[in-house]
Amino acid sequence: MTNIFLCAQIYQILALNDEMLKSGCITRDEHDFVRHVQTDKLTRLHSTP
């Protein structure tokens, strides 16, 4: 998979994560955990040459 595709996938996960928190499907702790993991992945992808 290309970096562009992987980044798009991460942004979709982050958007879904936010919506799940808003609708009460997940707790704030679960939301924060997913956000932390996905932003770490995004950082690694952006720092890869």
Question: What are these model-derived regions, one by one?
Answer:
Residues 1-49:
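Acidic, Ser/Pro/Thr-rich low-complexity regulatory regions
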